[in-house]
Amino acid sequence: MKKTRIRTRYAPSPTGYLHIGGARTALFNYLFAKHFNGDFIVRIEDTDIARNVAGGEESQLDNLEWLQIYPDESPKNPNEKYGKYRQSEKLDRYNEIVEILLKKGLAYKAYDTTYELEKQRAEQIAKGIFSFRYDRNWLKISDEEIKKREVEQTYSIRIALPKNHDYEWNDLVRGLIKVNSEDIGDWVIIKSDKYPTYNFAVVVDDFDMQISHVLRGEEHITNTPKQLAVYEAMGWDKPVFGHLTLITNSKGVKLSKRDDSVKQFISNYKEDGYVSWAISNYLALLGWTSKDTKEIMTKEELIEKFDPERLSASPSKFDMKKMNWYGKHYLQEINKNEIFEYLESLKDKKWLDLFIETFLPNAFSLSELKRELKEYENPMIEKPEIEINDVVKKFKQNLNFENFSVDSIQKAIDKTGTDLNVNGKKLFLPIRLATTFNEHGPELAKAIYLYGKEIIQKRLGNVN
């Protein structure tokens, strides 16, 4: 089969929701395909029935679209020319290929029970072989026992690897990689439950869909020689492989599900009201850089600039501060009506306009704006630990409650500084603490005004 058109794919399992690692993989495959005017495909690897999560497939597809990663083909918009887009719908196709391998003598039925496999593994460990390699000559059972296990269907099917054979590929990211068959051993292609294993099914899928390039995480490097074995056994052209760098936290430690220093699922960002392209823009620069080292890029720019030769093999740090820097940049461009819709506030439009004008410049997500809004919608009146000093007393004296406006508040702040000969933090911090109950915040006069005259009067009520 001659592959001329660039076709890439993202093939998640519906065993969980879209993770930043999976999203980065999908994005790179999308950008790569579109850079070369090719096709980007999403298919679902759902043969691990026990681990599939309800809503897992929908989460993958919906969140990809939210990130503005649109597949040319998927379970939602399949192309019948390339077969099914869910592995669970392709079992007959996998069995067809297995029969070919069995007839060629390139695969065989293995009748080992779980107990016998564990015994074989224990014997290898006793010999100092800690990476298990199946020995096809280990099991000694009678023909009668074989017939019994055949009837009971208690067997798996393994691929028969050639002796001392090198599987090698020129990795797009890491260069030439070579693995010998003696370091792999015959591996299972059809499990005893008659479902295909990942490393077998994925090759059939990639061949059927004419995938030209496979970009995926570095954890798949050990899978690649196994997959090459299937390509060679079937006499199929193999795709170009590229294994993307690991994503770590800001300290360089591999991400784990218990690591709360990073928002790890795309749905978290969606729920928190991040602008979707902020995430995509940041993910695009985890393991890849443009020649001009530009950081803010539209989708069109990324597609144009996505040179695979600039993929990095060094681990990429996911820094929430940097992520929020992107969030802040893109939030400034959002349509104000979207903000109103997300905030769901009963405040009048004029007040909301000023609130957004005041808090938006420092916000990185809509949920952050909503948190600030709650402080104004449900304000505390007293905060006992607030210390009242001369600055606050003078500010209260200078504040004109009869003409309560942003301008009058600013004049009161300025006059207080002049009267007491103070400025900077010594001026602003006591006033901010006494009026807003916060150490930090946006432009002080606006932050005070948004609470309204009555709340500020009550908060300054005990100041004499």
Swiss-Prot record:
This is Glutamate--tRNA ligase. It comes from Mycoplasma mobile (strain ATCC 43663 / 163K / NCTC 11711) (Mesomycoplasma mobile). Transmembrane segments: none annotated. GO terms for cellular component: cytosol. The gene is gltX. Keywords: Aminoacyl-tRNA synthetase, ATP-binding, Cytoplasm, Ligase, Nucleotide-binding, Protein biosynthesis. Monomer. It comes from the Bacteria. Catalyzes the attachment of glutamate to tRNA(Glu) in a two-step reaction: glutamate is first activated by ATP to form Glu-AMP and then transferred to the acceptor end of tRNA(Glu). One of its GO terms (biological process) is glutamyl-tRNA aminoacylation.
